[in-house]
């Protein structure tokens, strides 16, 4: 399931995002954030974290740097993958 979601995000990045322009108020962009969240947490929790991020990305938010939250447990498992 995660691979399918990552393909959807990549499709969005290459075909839809260029048409919309650079509108994300955060760094990394919401689509990059989604890729990281899905890679680290899997499809269910990654989608939930991404959903919360997209809700924050609106005109009344200042934006700024907002990285995917990484727990110590996930940090250790992420290092094993590398």
From Swiss-Prot:
Highest taxon of source: Bacteria
Pfam families: YidD
Main location: membrane
GO cellular component assignments: plasma membrane
Subcellular location: Cell inner membrane
InterPro entries named among the record's database cross-references: Membr_insert_effic_factor_YidD
Assigned keywords, A-Z: Cell inner membrane, Cell membrane, Membrane
Topology term for the membrane: Peripheral membrane protein
Function: Could be involved in insertion of integral membrane proteins into the membrane.
NCBIfam families, per the entry: membrane protein insertion efficiency factor YidD
HAMAP family per UniProt: UPF0161_YidD
Homology family: Belongs to the UPF0161 family.
The protein's name in its UniProt record: Putative membrane protein insertion efficiency factor
